[in-house]
C-alpha cells in the first residue's frame, strides 16, 4: 500500500469534521511516506491511484448509495468512514439496539444448518453494546460459552481455542472480530464453515448492501485515521473483502437532576434520521433544574456538534426548516427533531424564546 485514496464530497469540507478528516489523513500520509489522493466525486476517481480500494467519507445516505453504485463496476473495495455520523447523537441519553432480534436471527440461521453448540466470541468488556449482546446470549446459552476480550483479543482466542472442540458454531460480536477469528481458525487448520459455522454481527448501513464486510471502531479522529490505514493494508491482501466500515465511539451525556455521567455505546445507522424518538428507542433528556444558569447554557451549546450549532444559528437567523435542511444535509424531519430537542432542553417553546434567551445571556452561537 503506497497511497491513500480519499473520496469526500466538497460540501463536507465546510464542516470542521470534514476538514479534520482530510488533515489527519494528510498528516498520516506524510508521516508514513504515502501519497494522499483526495477526490470529491466518484466519477473522477483514478483507478490506478486507488490501488484496488478507496476510503469514502460522508453522512448523506443518498450520496453514499450513489458512490456505491458508481464504484461497483470498478471493483474497488470500499472503506467507509462513519465517524462523522456520531455528530447527530452527541447529546442523547441512550441508544437502544434490538439486539434480541439480531441474536434470534443468528440462532435461526444456525438452527437451519443443524448447529447447536454455539459460542459467543469477541465482546469488549465495558462496552455497552457488547454487554447487551452478552446478556441476550447468556439467556439462551451459558456464560461459560461467552469469550470476552479483557486484556487482548489474542488471549481471548487462546481461551476459546482450549475448548474449541466442543463447538460447531460461533457468533462474533461484530464483523471485524469475525474476520480476525476466521483468520486465526484458518491458521490453526479449522475450516469455515465446515468445522465452525461463523456469524459476524455487523452494525452499519453498508453491511446490508455490500457483503462480506468488516466493521471496526476507533475512539477519536486520529485513531480512526490510523485504524483505517491499517485496514486498507488488509483489503489489498484479501480480495474477498468487499467493504469496511470504520466508525468512532460516541461520548453519550445524560443530563439529569441527580447528576451527569458519560458512557460509550455503538450506533446503528437506522437511527440517523429519527422521526419519532420513542419509536427508535431514544430516551428523552431530563431537564436540569438550573437550566437557565449561564454556565449550564454554555455547557449545553459547547457540547453540541458543528451541525447542531449550524441548525441553531440558522434557526435564530429566521431561516426555514427546508433552508436549514439544505444547508446541513439532513432531512427536514431530522432538523425538526433537533429543534424540538433543544426547545425541550432549554424549557422553551419557540424560535423567539430561543433568541431572547441567547440575547439575555449574550451567548453567540
What do these predicted regions represent?
Residues 1-108, 164:
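Alpha-helical recognition/docking segments in bacterial nutrient-uptake
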Residues 285-306:
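Regulatory hinge/linker segments at domain boundaries
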Residues 92, 162-172, 176-177, 182-267:
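Flexible loop/turn connectors
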Residues 104-144, 244-260:
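An alpha-beta-alpha
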Residues 308-315, 354:
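Short alpha-helical "packing" element that flanks the helix-turn-helix/winged-helix DNA-binding module
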Residues 348-364:
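Short, basic, alpha-helical segments at the C-terminal edge of helix-turn-helix-like DNA-binding modules
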Residues 85, 93-120, 153-158, 178, ...:
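Hydrophobic alpha-helical segments within soluble ligand-binding/sensing domains
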Residues 318-353:
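Recognition helix of helix-turn-helix DNA-binding domains
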Amino acid at each position: 500500500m503506497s497511497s491513500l485514496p480519499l473520496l469526500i464530497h466538497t460540501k463536507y469540507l465546510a464542516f470542521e469534521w470534514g476538514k479534520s478528516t482530510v488533515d489527519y489523513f494528510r498528516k498520516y500520509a506524510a508521516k508514513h511516506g504515502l501519497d494522499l489522493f483526495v477526490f470529491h466525486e466518484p466519477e473522477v476517481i483514478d483507478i490506478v491511484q486507488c490501488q484496488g480500494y478507496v476510503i469514502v467519507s460522508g453522512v448523506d445516505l443518498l450520496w453514499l448509495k450513489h458512490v456505491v453504485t458508481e464504484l461497483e463496476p470498478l471493483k474497488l473495495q470500499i472503506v467507509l468512514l462513519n465517524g462523522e455520523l456520531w455528530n447527530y447523537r452527541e447529546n442523547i441519553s441512550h441508544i437502544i439496539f434490538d439486539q434480541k432480534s439480531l441474536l434470534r436471527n443468528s440462532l435461526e440461521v444456525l438452527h437451519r444448518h443443524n448447529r447447536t453448540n454455539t459460542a459467543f466470541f469477541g465482546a469488549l468488556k465495558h462496552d455497552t453494546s457488547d454487554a447487551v449482546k452478552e446478556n441476550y446470549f447468556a439467556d439462551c446459552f451459558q456464560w461459560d460459552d461467552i469469550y470476552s476480550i479483557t486484556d487482548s483479543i489474542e488471549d481471548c482466542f487462546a481461551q476459546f481455542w482450549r475448548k474449541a472442540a466442543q463447538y460447531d458454531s460461533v457468533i462474533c460480536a461484530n464483523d471485524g472480530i469475525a474476520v480476525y477469528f476466521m483468520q486465526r481458525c484458518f491458521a490453526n487448520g479449522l475450516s469455515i464453515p465446515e468445522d465452525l459455522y461463523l456469524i459476524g454481527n455487523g452494525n452499519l448501513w453498508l453491511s446490508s448492501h455490500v457483503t462480506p464486510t468488516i466493521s471496526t471502531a476507533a475512539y477519536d479522529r486520529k485513531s480512526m485515521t490510523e485504524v483505517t490505514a491499517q485496514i486498507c493494508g488488509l483489503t489489498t491482501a484479501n480480495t474477498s473483502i468487499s467493504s469496511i466500515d470504520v466508525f468512532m465511539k460516541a461520548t453519550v451525556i445524560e443530563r439529569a437532576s441527580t447528576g451527569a455521567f458519560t458512557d460509550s455505546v455503538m450506533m446503528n445507522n437506522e437511527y440517523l434520521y429519527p422521526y419519532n424518538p420513542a419509536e427508535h428507542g431514544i430516551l428523552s433528556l431530563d431537564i436540569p433544574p438550573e437550566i437557565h444558569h449561564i454556565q449550564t447554557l454554555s455547557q449545553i451549546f459547547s457540547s453540541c456538534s458543528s451541525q447542531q450549532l449550524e441548525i441553531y444559528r440558522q434557526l435564530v437567523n429566521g431561516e426555514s426548516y427546508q433552508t436549514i435542511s439544505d444547508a446541513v444535509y439532513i432531512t427536514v424531519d431530522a432538523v425538526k427533531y433537533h429543534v424540538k430537542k433543544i426547545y425541550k432542553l432549554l424549557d422553551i417553546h419557540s424560535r423567539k424564546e430561543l433568541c431572547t434567551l441567547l440575547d439575555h445571556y449574550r451567548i453567540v452561537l
